[in-house]
A protein has these predicted regions:
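Conserved two-metal-ion catalytic palm core of "right-hand" nucleic acid polymerases
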Residues: 1-205
Length: 205
């Protein structure tokens, strides 16, 4: 594994630094970090602290070796954030929030980068998989900007609302829909077959 181009890309200084550089864009819930990790999170805001960044990169590289070479797993914690009271059952409905320690989160992003960027040319250029998302998708779009893992949601939400407004105006004028879609968001993720997605990625999208 260590000899492969993919592994060398994942543990490269460039890839690990990019993951650290985008840190503020993917740690959505800093309050879920441990006290020590929260201190580290704020210290890593200074990307020019060479000693600290090199130390963290070493820790991340060690964790990646644990996972990729020694077949260890990342440890996750789940917190349940209360959303609302179900009027029918009287039960509190919650949204699960998954988190990990800060070094593991950076390691996960370093792994994700291998799916988003062109490994073969050893350049940080978005690859075919990252670019295959359709233009009318407004979710997590991989960003070309190093400080963002994904395009900022406010920017994508603005595009989404403009598109919805235009569609509504067209309907008002023509009384015709362009599409009719029925969605069951509750069952969306359980209905995904990871093997189909994996095969699609392996075939090169």
């Amino acid at each position: 594994m260590r000899r492969t181009k993919l592994y060398r890309f994942i543990v490269s200084d460039e890839n690990l630094f990019r993951a650290i550089y985008a840190l503020e864009s993917f740690v959505f819930e800093p309050k879920l970090l441990s006290a020590n990790d929260l201190v580290l999170f704020y210290r890593l805001h200074d990307k020019l602290n060479h000693t600290l960044v090199q130390d963290v990169m070493g820790q991340v590289r060690a964790r990646l070796e644990d996972v990729l070479v020694n077949d260890e797993l990342f440890s996750l914690r789940v917190y349940f954030n209360p959303k609302k009271l179900n009027p029918d059952t009287g039960e509190i409905e919650s949204r699960p929030l998954h988190t990990a320690n800060l070094v593991d989160q950076i390691a996960m992003v370093a792994l994700l980068n291998a799916l988003l960027f062109d490994v073969s040319d050893n350049k940080m250029i978005l690859n075919q998989l990252a670019l295959s998302l359709p233009p009318n998708f407004y979710g997590n779009i991989p960003s070309k900007e190093p400080k963002h893992l994904f395009v900022p949601w406010k920017e994508k939400y603005k595009e989404y609302t403009e598109s919805v407004t235009q569609s509504y105006e067209r309907y008002t004028e023509t009384k015709k829909y362009s599409h009719e879609v029925t969605l069951d968001l509750v069952q969306f993720f359980p209905s995904l077959n990871p093997l189909l997605v994996y095969d699609w990625i392996i075939r090169g999208c």
